[in-house]
């Protein structure tokens, strides 16, 4: 995963853009959709890399 990648959170069904990747912390994501989350577009969040996946991978397996 790298800066600028489009990602999908499997639990909240949010789509976002990777802002920063830090192995010791995780992935900083700017969410562009709300999905099932309480937080809307524009919210930034640090996520564990295991809880999100590349959107292109999700679209090819769905």
Language-model features and meaning:
Residues 53-62:
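Long, low-complexity intrinsically disordered regions
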């Amino acid at each position: 995963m790298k800066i600028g990648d489009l990602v999908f959170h499997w639990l909240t069904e949010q789509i976002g853009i990777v802002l920063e990747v830090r192995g010791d912390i995780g992935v900083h994501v700017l969410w562009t959709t709300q999905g099932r989350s309480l937080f809307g577009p524009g919210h930034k969040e640090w996520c564990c890399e295991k809880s999100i996946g590349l959107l292109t991978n999700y679209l090819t397996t769905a």
